[in-house]
Amino acid sequence: MYFTLGTIFNMESGDLLERVIAGLRELPINLVVTVGQDIDPLELGPQPIHVHIERFIPQSSVLPHCDLVVSHGGSGSVIGALAHGLPSVLIPMGADQPLNAERCVELGVAKVLDPIRATPEDVRAAASTVLEDPGYRRSAARIRDEIAALPGTGHAVALLERLAGEKRPIRRPL
């Protein structure tokens, strides 16, 4: 399982980081946590052997080995999870996160918790539910397949080159 509140703008979460770790570390899973450059993992105290807290690990290194992502619901975290067919527990705090979380619930790929009210028990229960209910995994796999079927970056580059070559402004019809 991978847990992150993002590695850049994650200092405004109060004790949410501690509450989530407290809930997840009681599950019989390996837990990888990233906290960003401004938080020293040692500040979070000793952890059980199955909990690994780092400042930063590339998502691309962690996600292929996960069954669930617990995150703030930022676009990078959500797209990363979905591209790997992983369901999520989302704890949105602001910006794009609440809208991302709402859409993930609509798609059946996530449960959402309130960042102010969520207790360690709530986090543990939500993670257990998503892990145990195969519907979340099936929905995430469906989205993964849709993402994989999209044209790649080569297609986007070709379109941009063509647009740049036309040397005309893009105008929308009135």
Cite the ranges covered by each PLM segment.
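Short hydrophobic alpha-helical runs that function as membrane-insertion/retention elements
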Residues: N30-V33, V89-L90, K111-L113
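A donor-sugar binding/catalytic signature common to diverse glycosyltransferases
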Residues: R55-R103
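C-terminal amphipathic helix plus adjacent low-complexity
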Residues: P120-L174
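Short, contiguous acidic/charged loop-to-helix segments that flank catalytic cores in large enzymes
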Residues: I8-E12, I53, I91-A95, D114-I116
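Donor-nucleotide binding loops and adjacent catalytic segments primarily
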Residues: M1-L68
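Residues at alpha-helix caps and immediate loop-helix transition turns in enzyme cores, especially N-
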Residues: S13-L16, N100, G152
